[in-house]
């Protein structure tokens, strides 16, 4: 299915420059891509961003923890891990007032501006289709831009481990789970099971995702050693596409057809809003999703 989508998308202007002839650097393989997901509306924290920034901008464009915005902090965490031309940003057109300044030094070809916010399902799908036009062997890291990590070096090591895990297990999606330090009810949780692979990267099967559990449930998850879900998700682009074709066929097929006809806005207007990570990984977790445990001092805004 993924090869059919790549073929159907040919002829669409790529969002990234073709630099396949450039020699590799210390930033890892040129098949490694980072996609920063910055298209959310941030409705839950609008009252907070209003107090901090003086307007109701989405939280990724706000300095929630002081200093730089969450988006800028996310960029900084990834800059040593990926080639610059392999870093893409998925944003929403209505937020251009905010992201245009944040991304003023980023070439327009690396900014995927969605006509509307339709959740992570659409954001992941449109990014994958853009990448697969350029690199059929891509390994993609999807990173939400609404998290804070106190230990950026540990985060970088965890991302590298997740990439290695995805390369060792090409039919699996790998998700990072952060060590939980208290029974947080506003976070998603991951319950890990048996080992998928041990060396060199220990990868554990995800038995279940828990999205915003009750306090008694969160306490039980903490006692069982379950992890906070960072939603940092890694896998081969073709594996992601196969998952989307299985779980969200109407989304990825609609976007693929719309890209070929330059009718993306019309497709988005007809599309439901779907959170891929919260709603769609669960049914496939036992067979396709593995987790890596790490501790980088995560705090989700």
Predicted regions and their residues:
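Conserved N-terminal catalytic core of the sugar/cofactor nucleotidyltransferase
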Residues: 2-58, 63-160
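Conserved donor-nucleotide/metal-binding helix-loop-beta segment in metal-dependent transferases, i.e.
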Residues: 151-184
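Short, active-site-adjacent cap segments at secondary-structure transitions
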Residues: 44, 96-98, 148-150, 182-185, ...
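Solvent-exposed alpha-helices and their adjacent loops that cap or buttress functional pockets
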Residues: 24-29, 54, 80-82, 133-135, ...
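Structural signal for hydrophobic packing residues in well-ordered secondary-structure cores
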Residues: 42, 49, 75-82, 103, ...
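Conserved beta-strand scaffold positions in the cores of enzyme catalytic domains, especially
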Residues: 61, 111, 173-175, 289-291
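Catalytic core of tubulin tyrosine ligase-like
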Residues: 189-301
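A short acidic, often aromatic-flanked loop/helix-cap motif at beta-alpha or helix-coil junctions
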Residues: 117-122, 182-184, 215-216, 297-300
């Amino acid at each position: 299915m993924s090869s059919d989508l790549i073929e159907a998308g040919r002829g669409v202007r790529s969002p990234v420059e073709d630099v396949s002839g450039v020699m590799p650097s210390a930033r890892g393989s040129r098949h490694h891509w980072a996609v920063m997901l910055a298209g959310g509306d941030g409705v839950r924290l609008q009252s907070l961003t209003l107090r901090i920034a003086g307007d109701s901008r989405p939280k990724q464009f706000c300095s929630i923890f002081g200093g730089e915005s969450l988006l800028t902090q996310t960029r900084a965490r990834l800059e040593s891990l990926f080639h610059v031309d392999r870093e893409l940003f998925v944003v929403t057109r209505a937020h251009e007032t905010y992201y245009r300044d944040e991304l003023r030094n980023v070439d327009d070809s690396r900014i995927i501006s969605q006509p509307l916010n339709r959740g992570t399902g659409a954001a992941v799908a449109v990014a994958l289709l853009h990448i697969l036009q350029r690199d059929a062997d891509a390994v993609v890291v999807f990173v939400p831009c609404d998290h804070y990590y106190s230990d950026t070096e540990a985060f970088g090591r965890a991302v590298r481990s997740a990439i290695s895990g995805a390369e060792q297990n090409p039919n699996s999606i790998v998700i990072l789970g952060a060590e939980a330090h208290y029974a947080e009810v506003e976070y998603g949780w991951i319950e890990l099971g048996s080992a998928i692979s041990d060396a060199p990267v220990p990868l554990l099967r995800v038995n279940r995702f828990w999205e915003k559990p009750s306090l008694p449930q969160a306490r039980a998850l903490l006692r069982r050693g379950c992890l906070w879900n960072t939603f940092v998700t890694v896998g081969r682009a073709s594996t992601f596409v196969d998952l989307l074709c299985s779980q969200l066929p109407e989304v990825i097929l609609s976007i693929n057809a719309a890209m070929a006809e330059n009718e993306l806005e019309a497709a988005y207007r007809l599309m439901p809003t779907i959170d891929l990570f919260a709603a769609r990984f669960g049914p496939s977790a036992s067979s396709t999703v593995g987790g890596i445990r790490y501790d980088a001092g995560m705090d989700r805004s």
